[in-house]
Amino acid sequence: MISVTDIRRAFLDNECHTITKAFGYLHEDKAIALIKIGFHPTYIPKVLYNNVVEFVPEKLYLFKPRTVSPLDLISTITKLKNVDKFAAHINYHKNSILITGDKSLIVKCMPYMIISDDDIRFIREQFVGTNSIEYILSFINKESVYRMSYQFSENEIVTIINRDHFMYEPIYEHQVLDSDFLKTMLDRYGIVPINSGIIDDLCPEAIIEILMAVVRPRDAIRFLDIVNKNQLTENSVKNYIINDIRRGKIDYYIPYVEDFLEDRTEDLGIYANIFFEDAIDITKLDITKTELEHISKYMNYYTTYIDHIVNIILQNNYIDILASIIDYVQDVLTEELCIRIVCESTNPVPVTSLPIHSTLVMVMCIQMKYVDIVEFLDEIDIDTLIEKGADPITEYTFTTRWYNKHNDLITLYIKKYGFCPMMMKRLMFEYPLTKEASDHLLKTMDENRGAIMFFPRTIYTLPYLLCCNYKLIQKPIPFKEENRNIEYKKTNRVLCFDSLENAAFKSLIKIDSIPGLKTYNMKDITYEKSNDIICVRFIPQDSIHNEERRIKLQLFDIARLASYGLYYIPSRYLSLWTPVVNMIEGREYTNPQKIECLVILDLFSEEFIEYQNLGNAVSNKYELEYTISNYQAAINCLMSTLLIYLVLGSIRSISRTEDFVLSILNIFYKGLKINELLSEPVSGVCIELDKIKDRASSGDSSFIFLKKNELSKTLSLCEKVCVETILDNNQSFKSSK
């Protein structure tokens, strides 16, 4: 349990109405300790500024922009890849950032700064060369474009749009463009020419051709606004738009129809009532299912005919359509119809729209995985919800007032997330708790210290261990005396580094000292310094020609190196996947969407990061919003690596899949020096891996896309292995003390 004793004391002693207010009364040391683990209000008191600068500078965004000094800001954001949380601070200190003349820093900050014409002139003076200017300006934001008079060149526009497609909107509003350029952008990028530069080239045929390319209602409305009214009254244009409305593109033409099609209501048919009040008696029409689907969004225009529409829906068993208009048909909904809507409709309906909140309806909602089950609390007690297997604690619940209505719901939340700083921060500092609810929350947490509320299951889950453990113990790397009596041959290779402090060089030397590695591709390493360059000479290892054996031994090496505090980041295979971040934020995670490479490549020293630098390295590699701990980063590396070697290894394996999986697990444990044997069956994992193998072998792609939850069993296995790793590491450490 997160310790809230000091916060509770401050809350009671100072008669605070909010937990945020109580946080401001904490002693600086206590406050900084909580800030370090991500447990803090949206803003923190100025008195903490110096401590934050010293201990957690990446949290400077918690102060208002005027409080943060430009030097502290620049020093901090220079080291971070993701600076989204500093958006307001970056714009506030725009001039200080531009004056640095640091191109990479300016590029990083451009999306957040409101750039003026004077700023552009300054940038042009600082950076000579068209390519540099185009590159920097490509990161400009729409707010800047709306406020400046600077005219972008066509090349600059293309560069900007290549980076952010939707920047076409402010740019097209900003300046008149050549018609040929507009046509090219339409053909190449599908960008509607909403610019006065196209007006002279428009005719009815061109208007229709452009409308055929429109994919956003806003673009259609804005384009028709610039077209000459005489052309909009052409019959060919009218006929095309009427047919487009019949195809369901109603939002695209609402202003146009009201201005130009008042005399064509019969041609509009059932859709006429959306634009003109009760224009058509729809009881005289043969209404199709497609038409019902189209008008369901606009049912407020058909209230006169709601009984007629409901009769058609029920006669034809159109449950999906009934669900889409549920707020207009409350009087006809029985318990049976509510259950049918819940079970048969493609999209979930809001529980608040179901007029009957019976236990049976609730059970059906639970089975269909509804996220707003909490709304049944208006009729059903929380114990019944839990007994039936409901989880009322979801993202949706934050949008309601239920936490202030039910103390039992807060208690349930604490049982689920009381160990998780991120999730408790959301409820305590970001949700508008009443004073009474805040008091209950703090009392419950303070009176249930330790792990009392999380026994027996939660404490052995990976999310719990990620939040409650803070380190992995590393084995000391043995000293290896440098061998200077090596005879070099023509087959020797040389690597050069800029200093002895180079991270890749330090990793290389440490790797060379670790005994028992099987596949690391360098042996007989020696190095010397020459003209400020570090030259490393080595003999390449002999290749292992059996692919399956190479993969297994390589995983052994990765695990063995991890046991000595050198971790492999498999970003070449998984460029975006960080399951640990989801877990420490209390969110569900799924398998990666894509594996970038289907061949397991050789290992290189620069891919291994020392444990003490791992949090920063992983956070920057994946451009995370905040820096995760070294411990959390290590688990992310192990879980990602194991997943990759299971998936890609099984694709390359010629063994029976079950034998391969068990062998991989055994090797992984041996590499980490863990004396564990996983007792769980792996048949479900094998089924998933075989499907991936079949799909990969039937194509010739160098990568593979994965469907959501396609590897759920495999991920569960990887989680269990990580749990065993953490528990063994901590137990081994205790035993050795």
UniProtKB/Swiss-Prot annotation:
Relate the induction remark in this record: Expressed in the early phase of the viral replicative cycle.
| Keyword Cell membrane annotated | no
Where does the source fall among the domains of life? Answer: Viruses
Modification after translation is described as: N-acetylated on initiator methionine by host.
Task: Establish whether keyword Membrane is in the entry.
Answer: no
Pfam families linked: Pox_E2-like (PF04497)
Q: Which residues carry this modification: N-acetylmethionine?
A: M1
Keywords of this entry:
Acetylation, Disulfide bond, Early protein
Question: What InterPro entries has UniProt attached to this entry?
Answer: Poxvirus_E2, Poxvirus_E2/O1
* Cystine pairings recorded for this chain: C496-C535
Q: According to its UniProt record, which protein family does this protein belong to?
A: Belongs to the orthopoxvirus OPG064 family.
On subunit structure and binding partners, the annotation says: Interacts with host KLC2; this interaction promotes IEV trafficking by engaging the host kinesin-1 complex. Interacts with protein OPG056.
Q: What does this protein do?
A: Plays a role in intracellular enveloped virus (IEV) transport to the cell surface on microtubules. Together with protein OPG056, forms a complex that interacts with host KLC2 (kinesin light chain isoform 2) to engage the kinesin-1 complex and thereby promote IEV trafficking.
Tell me what this protein is called.
Protein OPG064
